[in-house]
């Protein structure tokens, strides 16, 4: 089922992206920023863990109806319809992306999460690194801030 909503000059599509991309003209928009699925874990039974936490709290059940890892035709279509692209997780796909890379250092220390995320960026021919803390609830605009208390008005005023 295809649904479309218009908000000013922004159009939101709720449909299979391949159907939408095939219908679009070449260079339809200036920049595509995407983070496609890169592994099939959510399709596997029990991927999201046990039905109860170690404390006995019941976890919500999220049914995964469709989780498809894109093939090369997705990237071909995406590059056809967009003038520039930023594609997160480019290191997981067998596609001949150009040289430009963005490396996000998540400043997450010793955790089970990846230390970095890598994106292809067609706007550059080099590698750019930026650090932005992301480790579950520890998020920040500055590495020096450490854990951010979301309701901390004084800290938010200092940022402005």
Q: Which residues does each PLM region occupy?
A:
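SAM-dependent nucleic-acid methyltransferase catalytic core
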Residues: 1-33
